[in-house]
Amino acid sequence: MVNAKQAQANKEDAKAWTLLENTLQASLQEQRRTRRWGIFFKSLTFLYLFVAIMLFSPLGNMDAASTSTGPHTAVIEVRGLIADQQEASADNLITSLRRAFDDENTRGIVMRINSPGGSPVQSGYIYDEIRRLRKEHPDTPVYAVITDLGASGAYYIAAAADEIYADRSSLVGSIGVTAAGFGFVGTLDKLGIERRTYTSGEHKAFLDPFQPERQDERQFWENVLENTHQQFIDRVKEGRGDRLADNEDLFTGLIWNGEQALELGLVDGLGSTSMVARDVIGVENTTDFTYRESPFERFTRQLGTSVGNTLAVHLGLSGPVIR
């Protein structure tokens, strides 16, 4: 009798445990289903927002320019790093310049600059286009106004203007070229890591930070930078002419404030955008022709820049920068 009761009790306990196990499994399955649906709806919401931004954001915003009426001074912002896939890229700034020059109501153009510089290639493209457009539109002057900073590649661009203005405390100059990197020779050996590099040219990997620096390759790279620096100097002399002071420090990479830059002939006067529009161009009404990225463009640019920078790091690609 006792054994029968014990067996019955064990059987009931087993049923209870089985029921509890089934209940827990059902609960876990329900949680998994809920989690999956949560992920699905979150993904769907993200996709909806992404598509909405893509469909309803314009490819580029220049609405202010398109609605301008009457004579005006065109203003184009040059902000941040001057480089491809950046807001201050040659493509964006040249687009803005062409639209400003082609507008029949434009009486003058102000390039409002606040930039540390960047790519000599992008700066050169913009410089050349300003000079070309000035020849096509001889009655439309171009002025550069440096606000906080107009250094290196930014000054390269400013040199193409008819005149350059700055604030007393603006930082102007830094006419030089730099290319920086690091040397990690011996680091991998200490970590017990063997690095294998395969090239088809003797100097193909001369910028590899994990290889010892060779004197002949260092000299070669310095010659490249010196040649690029000379191109920069030639453009500044072409744009500024005899307004430049005879000062041996002018092209050494030093930077000066606005008052000092005026004495050195790097700028023509002290003033703001509104002052130039009012007192120099003679049309106080300003219209912004700056190319503005849409949120979608900004997202894709940042994504592309991130991927490109990663590839550049892995491939050991680092070009000269004028800043």
Which residue stretches match the model-derived regions?
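N-terminal organellar transit peptides
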Residues: 1-167, 178-323
